[in-house]
């Protein structure tokens, strides 16, 4: 009987329940609750469910005491040196193998490949000036970098230059880009930045309208824009090729993101590779999304997530997103003045690369002022320009701080 009781005690002591009673064990419980809350947002509120659901579940898995789902000590350093490979291959598990795709920068470009197969650049081609709105919205990224450096200077928090740059990229409202930059510059902040980036992407309809209305007048919001011209198939085919060449020559570090985005779009527009275009936009993208979100979720351990830095990252992420929206709207107002009132400033807010949510918000706010107004296609120009802009901004940050 004594042996039986000792066996039961031994089983309990080796279980995860016993570890909740250890010093700091309550942190695991907090992280599990955070994961469950994100699952609630994904399932009930439908906030970016394709990403948040596997990410939140990965967060729960990684914070179950004793589970040993991922071993982040194998990934210390800037690259994967020979001893790390040996440790990962011999002692690593599923999450370790999947995380190698994040560490090596494989998943985000493949996500961009899938995005490219679903992106329509015709509104941008027919109105090239909308590229400026997409570029203007990226000012939020660089403004937030300065904000992070200012916070560090005041002593409130200690962010390095690389960490500040990784946080700033949240302002691009592009999850894969944020993960790509963070994995290169500040992998220790990957979980916090990924959660913030995708949360704010889901909150586009909540965050943007108050900023848009505060910076524009009723007259400006009521502007009806002329119908866009029809774009030929030749233009749609040449565009991704030329963008890849020009952007890669100007910002070589953006070549992999922009190149994969444009390859996906070329597959879509050329019309001769339907089979691989559908695979890249459906099966491949779905598989990579699962791998990416699950592995990123597994990096959110209690000791790296539950600290004041995460709180500042969330605040700075909101500032970055708000700055990007405001910069786009203000540049839209400038174009409104220069065009003699022919450009609706609301389309400037779509310069952040949350496709197509930001464009839909421009449409909704515009129709609330003028029910006969249809801004969606006009807003899609800055929206897809924002995707290119965020990739270019990522390349610039990696070039400077990488």
Each language-model region and where it sits:
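Intrinsically disordered, low-complexity non-transmembrane regions of multi-pass membrane transporters
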Residues: 1-23, 29, 75-87, 91, ...
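Transmembrane helical segments that form the transport core of multi-pass membrane transport proteins
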Residues: 244-328
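Alpha-helical membrane segments and immediately flanking helix-loop junctions
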Residues: 100-104, 112-118, 133-143, 147, ...
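Membrane-embedded hairpin module used as a gating/binding unit in multi-pass transport
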Residues: 196-272
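Alpha-helical transmembrane segments
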Residues: 188-206, 316-324, 347
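Entry/N-cap segments of selected transmembrane alpha helices
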Residues: 123-145, 301-328, 379-383
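Hydrophobic transmembrane alpha-helices of secondary-active transporters
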Residues: 61, 99-125, 264-267, 285-307
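Flexible hinge motifs at transmembrane-helix junctions and intramembrane kinks/re-entrant loops
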Residues: 39-53, 57, 66-69, 154, ...
């Amino acid at each position: 009987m004594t042996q039986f009781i000792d066996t039961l005690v031994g089983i309990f002591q080796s279980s995860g329940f016993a570890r909740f009673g250890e010093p700091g064990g309550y942190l695991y419980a907090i992280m599990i609750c955070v994961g469950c809350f994100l699952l609630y947002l994904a399932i009930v509120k439908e906030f970016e469910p394709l990403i948040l659901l596997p990410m939140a579940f990965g967060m729960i898995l990684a914070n179950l005491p004793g589970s040993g789902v991922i071993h982040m000590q194998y990934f210390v350093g800037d690259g994967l040196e020979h001893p790390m490979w040996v440790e990962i291959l011999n002692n690593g598990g599923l999450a370790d193998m999947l995380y190698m795709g994040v560490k090596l920068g494989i998943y985000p470009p493949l996500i961009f490949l899938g995005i490219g197969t679903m992106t329509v650049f015709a509104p941008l081609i027919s109105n090239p000036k909308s590229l400026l709105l997409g570029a203007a919205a990226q000012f939020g990224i660089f403004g937030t970098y300065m904000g992070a450096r200012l916070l560090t200077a005041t002593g409130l928090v200690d962010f390095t230059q690389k960490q500040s740059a990784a946080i700033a990229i949240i302002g691009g409202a592009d999850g894969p880009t944020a993960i790509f930059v963070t994995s290169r510059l500040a992998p220790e902040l990957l979980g916090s930045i990924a959660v913030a980036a995708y949360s704010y992407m889901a909150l586009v309809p909540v965050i943007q309208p108050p900023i848009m209305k505060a910076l524009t007048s009723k007259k400006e919001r009521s502007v009806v824009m002329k119908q866009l011209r029809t774009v030929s198939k030749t233009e749609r085919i040449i565009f991704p090729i030329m963008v890849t060449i020009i952007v890669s020559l100007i910002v070589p570090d953006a070549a992999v993101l922009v190149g994969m985005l444009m390859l996906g779009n070329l597959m879509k527009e050329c019309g001769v590779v339907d089979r691989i275009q559908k695979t890249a936009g459906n099966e491949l993208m779905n598989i990579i999304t699962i791998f990416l979100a699950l592995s990123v979720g597994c990096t959110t351990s209690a000791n790296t997530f539950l600290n004041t830095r995460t709180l500042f990252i969330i605040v700075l992420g909101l500032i970055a997103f708000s700055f990007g929206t405001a910069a786009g709207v203000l540049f839209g107002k400038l174009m409104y003045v220069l065009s003699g009132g022919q450009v609706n400033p609301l389309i400037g807010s779509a310069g952040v690369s949350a496709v197509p949510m930001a464009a839909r918000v421009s449409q909704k706010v515009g129709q609330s002022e003028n029910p006969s107004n249809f801004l969606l296609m006009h807003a899609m120009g800055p929206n897809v320009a924002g995707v290119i802009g965020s990739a270019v901004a990522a390349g610039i940050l990696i070039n400077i701080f990488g």
